[in-house]
């Protein structure tokens, strides 16, 4: 992810504006309603002059007759405009949140695997949920305050200047002083807000780890460790919030003090005979009341800066993700079905952020329809080889060919359509069994095809025992299934996909011996006429492979058939002896 660029608030908002612009009709309606709302308040104050000078001054008693009707009308107008503005702003805010979340979700789906290796799931979830909400809610709340309070200030100033420009001119001095005060605290607000976004990600990550690993926490007695971890990040979040409150609380009294000094000076100036001669009781009441009324919008405008800076800080974290480079998909070649010839030529690969290569000078040919097994100790590079075929990572040196063409010549969609993957880490979705088997292509397959795939994977036995059979919801990541059942659903998914290239990465590791024997027949059938790359820990499952390749520290050290490798008395023979106790 790129570093958060310290963009100015204006630059950040300009970049956000194209997301808001399609919904500007709602903003315009809300703006008009807010201005009318502020105007009704200002006009209400202006009624004090005729009420005092004419009504209670007994020069025009009719004022007391029409005044109640005007007040009722103004309150009705105020209520209507308040509803319209709130509704329109909420509508725009909801649309912006939805748009930002969709952009983030779509962009993240196009990110390379290396991106997710470096980012915690909790932080990314926080970006999609919390930060995107902050952008819209803070910005919309700030907009309401700026328009309504800004209109109030302008209206009050106009009215004050109309009734007594001599007294009102004093308040003009306030503007630059208030502006300086707001600018001073702006940077502080934005800095704290950025820290709050990051801390919220840590809170989400800590909670997510506990929820996902709840069984491990219980079995290993990790309650105290997880509690301390969560207490630490939640307290950090609290401290950041207190810093924000502190900065906001300091700015409020400063602005109010400046305004009160100006107000005191106005009262003093009003006592001058030259000024008093031109003032009536109604006029001085209107001007003085307007000055007091200015306190609220001035305070709100000071607070809105913190709110707006919080939204812009969240916006910058989202733009940092949106600026991250997605998977390179520069290939043009599109095929319906590959023959399945695979070849690694002098391939070297290093994981991003590491210095030592995970694979070095790998040369490997897998003819179409043949089965090649990769064996070796944990961390030797077996799964890395498999992940390069699907271009989850791009190699540093060399070439990987499919049907004689470099993998980078194919579009990613076309390439990955040729590969079915069953790994030891099966991910299932909170959906029906049938939809998990036919994942992403439910419309392409008939019910009979889905059932046949499940039957071939020896999954129908336990599926039929479920309340709703294939239509049973299996919970998040198949929480309602055993490890072996989840694995068989994944194998059924691969059987249904019917791709020419098959990768089995410890595909039977979660199965008991009896289930493994049962499903091995289905896997043998699945591997017929397909290019198969089998990564196995149990050597008994790969003895019939056309070729067995032994990987050690990222290098191919042995290759041959099962019997040939045993005869060499090398690494494979040692692994075989360790497993079978010979």
Curated annotation (Swiss-Prot):
This is ATP-dependent lipid A-core flippase. The gene is msbA. It comes from Salmonella typhimurium (strain LT2 / SGSC1412 / ATCC 700720). Residues 342-578 form the ABC transporter domain. GO terms for molecular function: ABC-type transporter activity; ATP binding; ATP hydrolysis activity; ATPase-coupled lipid transmembrane transporter activity; identical protein binding. Residues 28-310 form the ABC transmembrane type-1 domain. GO terms for cellular component: plasma membrane. Involved in lipopolysaccharide (LPS) biosynthesis. Translocates lipid A-core from the inner to the outer leaflet of the inner membrane. Transmembrane domains (TMD) form a pore in the inner membrane and the ATP-binding domain (NBD) is responsible for energy generation. It catalyses: ATP + H2O + lipid A-core oligosaccharideSide 1 = ADP + phosphate + lipid A-core oligosaccharideSide 2. GO terms for biological process: transmembrane transport.
